[in-house]
Swiss-Prot record:
A molecular function GO annotation: hormone activity
Chief site of localization: secreted
InterPro entries: Insulin, Insulin-like, Insulin-like_sf, Insulin_CS, Insulin_family
GO CC terms, sorted: extracellular space
Keywords attached to this entry: Carbohydrate metabolism, Disulfide bond, Glucose metabolism, Hormone, Secreted
Underlying gene: INS
Pfam families: Insulin
Protein name per its UniProtKB record: Insulin
Domain of life: Eukaryota
Cellular compartment(s): Secreted
């Protein structure tokens, strides 16, 4: 996994891969779009959104 811009369905797919069965907490207000779409985010940042 390389740090990258993740937007829309790509962001959701990445969360499914990272979080697996734990699932994830996704709301536009959580800042994940700013962190991962506007900016570049890492695997570790994505894990912060797992349940």
């Amino acid at each position: 996994f390389v740090b990258q811009h993740l937007c829309g369905s790509h962001l959701v797919e990445a969360l499914y891969l990272v979080c697996g069965e734990r699932g994830f907490f996704y709301t536009p207000k959580s800042g994940i779009v700013d962190q991962c779409c506007t900016s570049i985010c890492s695997l570790y940042q994505l894990e912060n959104y797992c349940n």
